[in-house]
């Protein structure tokens, strides 16, 4: 009977749970799904991470290559994120060129990289005007069940913290790059951006970490990205219900709390990996 009601009136079905301050999956309104992270998942990448947020699963691989620095910024390198949402992860996606959600997510990740200064582009310059690193950050969703922005942001941060680059010098006589693979160092990850997403129901009720179904039924979504100092790096609000200043402040404070939880989880995994 309940399954039939959910099929015929999915929104009303959800409302009955929300009135009791809970959700159909058993979580409270402010409760996140179980979150796990593994780093170094792809042996052929320069850095990688696999993040699971409930059923939503994202893997990020970072590949470093050489390139000439931009003409207008000769002392900088590049960070190039790309998000792939293949049909493999959900029946809602089709084969072919990237769909709108994949493009929006890629742009969101690019904005997070730029606004948070997680990697300073100057740190990627090897020789000004001559040579710089390009970090290709490929994020692939393996299983889609909502809140892709949080999962991608976490996977990117974890993968960047796993990247080790070899020492590179320019031979003055030949003007060629010489790579010392025996001498590698970790990237200088300067900040720790963490995304926290919310769904709005009936224009007033906020829930955190929405599933795919909750996103579909909601009247709007909001993603807040904060750094380790509690500073706002990004705010992503793709239309939908408006929010009062008090609601936004509530989202900010919840995002700061979530940042501490995610940072603690990532630090524990990194420490265990580096002590192996």
Curated annotation (Swiss-Prot):
CDD domains named among the record's database cross-references: RNase_PH_RRP43
Keyword check for Cytoplasm: yes
UniProt cross-references to InterPro entries, sorted A to Z: ExoRNase_PH_dom1 (IPR001247), ExoRNase_PH_dom2 (IPR015847), ExoRNase_PH_dom2_sf (IPR036345), Exosome_comp_Rrp42_subfam (IPR050590), PNPase/RNase_PH_dom_sf (IPR027408), Ribosomal_Su5_D2-typ_SF (IPR020568), Rrp43 (IPR033196)
GO term, biological process aspect, one: RNA catabolic process
Superkingdom per UniProt: Eukaryota
UniProt subcellular location: Cytoplasm; Nucleus, Nucleolus; Nucleus
KW Cytoplasm (keyword) present: yes
Functional summary from the UniProt entry: Non-catalytic component of the RNA exosome complex which has 3'->5' exoribonuclease activity and participates in a multitude of cellular RNA processing and degradation events. In the nucleus, the RNA exosome complex is involved in proper maturation of stable RNA species such as rRNA, snRNA and snoRNA, in the elimination of RNA processing by-products and non-coding 'pervasive' transcripts, such as antisense RNA species and promoter-upstream transcripts (PROMPTs), and of mRNAs with processing defects, thereby limiting or excluding their export to the cytoplasm.
Subunit: Component of the RNA exosome core complex (Exo-9), composed of EXOSC1, EXOSC2, EXOSC3, EXOSC4, EXOSC5, EXOSC6, EXOSC7, EXOSC8 and EXOSC9; within the complex interacts with EXOSC5 and EXOSC6. The catalytically inactive RNA exosome core complex (Exo-9) associates with the catalytic subunit EXOSC10/RRP6. Exo-9 may associate with DIS3 to form the nucleolar exosome complex, or DIS3L to form the cytoplasmic exosome complex. Exo-9 is formed by a hexameric base ring consisting of the heterodimers EXOSC4-EXOSC9, EXOSC5-EXOSC8 and EXOSC6-EXOSC7, and a cap ring consisting of EXOSC1, EXOSC2 and EXOSC3.
Sequence similarity: Belongs to the RNase PH family.
Name by which UniProt lists this protein: Exosome complex component RRP43
Source organism of the structure: Mus musculus
Upper classification of the organism: Eukaryota, Metazoa, Chordata, Craniata, Vertebrata
